[in-house]
């Protein structure tokens, strides 16, 4: 079965416990290729825990988590070939001492498989895809907050050349529009949809902003009391 036909995410009876308290209690979820999902719920309900599990930053206490049909039994840093999961943080998390081009192309440079010119071309294409022009040689501190956020989206578009054409990333967005004014919110919401489409991936957005939930997702899951209380479009 090709990757494009397999579920991207499968959670089966998954439990995540802190001490004696289950944050997530025997939850199950399946995400198909191309799907855009929003995870909602009150503060402390476990929304961020869902993202951290999908990002490989934590392992479930029990139950099964599969990404791209591979069981996740090790933390991301302990895997030799981790799944293609890309996290866009609430704050852009850019390295201040590197230029925009160096930030966006960081992983490609570390892998050392492409020439500097090839990396530059890929970075330029990703920056243009998020509406940024002529900023490659600037530093994050020289950009507005909104532009920095766009740079973090461009970074999420960078593909690993080792992965084939069928590669389909899972993009995770943690409160991407928190603290933004309505106009900036709309731009970022459009960007979530565009970034996910351009990357040919699927996305999970954690948000409490109603417009973000409505505009950037086709399906919503509500986390409350350790359970996925309902799921719908």
Q: What do the predicted segments below correspond to?
A:
Residues 166, 171-174:
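Catalytic Walker B motif of ABC-type/P-loop ATPase nucleotide-binding domains
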Residues 72-86, 110, 116:
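ABC ATPase NBD coupling module
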Residues 116-135:
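Conserved ABC ATPase "signature" region
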Residues 207-208:
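H-loop/switch region of ABC-family ATPase nucleotide-binding domains
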Residues 139-143, 147:
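Conserved ABC ATPase signature
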Residues 55:
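Helix-to-loop junction immediately C-terminal to a conserved catalytic motif
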Residues 40-42:
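The feature captures the beta-strand-to-loop junction immediately N-terminal to the Walker
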Residues 213-215:
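A short, surface-exposed alpha-helical micro-motif characterized by mixed small hydrophobic
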């Amino acid at each position: 079965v090709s990757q494009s036909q397999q579920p991207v995410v499968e959670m089966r009876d998954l439990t995540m416990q802190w001490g004696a308290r289950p944050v997530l209690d025997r939850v199950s979820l399946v995400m198909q290729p191309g799907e855009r999902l929003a995870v909602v719920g009150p503060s402390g309900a476990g929304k961020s825990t869902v993202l951290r599990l999908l990002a490989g930053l934590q392992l479930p206490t029990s139950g099964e988590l599969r990404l791209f049909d591979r069981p996740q039994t090790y933390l991301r840093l302990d895997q030799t070939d981790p799944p293609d999961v890309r996290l866009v943080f609430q704050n852009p998390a850019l390295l201040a001492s590197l230029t925009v081009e160096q930030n966006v192309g960081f992983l490609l440079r570390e892998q050392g498989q492409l020439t500097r010119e090839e990396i530059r071309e890929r970075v330029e294409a990703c920056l243009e895809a998020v509406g940024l022009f002529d900023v490659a040689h600037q530093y994050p501190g020289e950009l507005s907050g909104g532009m920095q956020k766009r740079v973090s989206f461009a970074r999420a578009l960078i593909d690993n050349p080792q992965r084939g054409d069928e590669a389909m990333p899972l993009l995770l967005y943690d409160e991407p529009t928190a603290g933004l004014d309505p106009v900036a919110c709309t731009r970022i919401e459009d960007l979530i949809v565009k970034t996910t489409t351009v990357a040919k991936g699927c996305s999970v957005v954690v948000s409490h902003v109603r417009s973000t939930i409505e505009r950037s997702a086709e399906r919503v899951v509500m986390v409350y009391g350790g359970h996925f209380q309902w799921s719908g479009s």
